[in-house]
Amino acid sequence: MTKITSDDVRKVATLARLNLPEDLIDTYTSQLEKILGYVAQLEEVDTEDIPPTSRAVEVTNVLREDIIQETDIREDLINLAPNREGDFFRVPKILSE
């Protein structure tokens, strides 16, 4: 495995647009080297008989079909608004021209 240098960490930080404090560069260098060591260990694991997957556990869709229901609460909801104009909610302006 290639040795990670402080310059490597600075370059990665620049590419990631991170502003790393200079006094922590050595700490991050050591941590990044350990992480890459773990990745190297994972590369040695035999995965020949393991099927490719995108998740560690099986995921099923638990959503239900939408049910359209007629309701009479439109006016009640509009009346709850602190500020309205006719059938519309009035909200503070957030964009300028």
From Swiss-Prot:
It is an enzyme of class 6 (ligase). Transmembrane segments: none annotated. Keywords: ATP-binding, Ligase, Nucleotide-binding, Protein biosynthesis. Belongs to the GatC family. PANTHER family: GLUTAMYL-TRNA(GLN) AMIDOTRANSFERASE SUBUNIT C, MITOCHONDRIAL. Allows the formation of correctly charged Asn-tRNA(Asn) or Gln-tRNA(Gln) through the transamidation of misacylated Asp-tRNA(Asn) or Glu-tRNA(Gln) in organisms which lack either or both of asparaginyl-tRNA or glutaminyl-tRNA synthetases. The reaction takes place in the presence of glutamine and ATP through an activated phospho-Asp-tRNA(Asn) or phospho-Glu-tRNA(Gln). This is Aspartyl/glutamyl-tRNA(Asn/Gln) amidotransferase subunit C. It comes from Prochlorococcus marinus (strain MIT 9211). The gene is gatC.
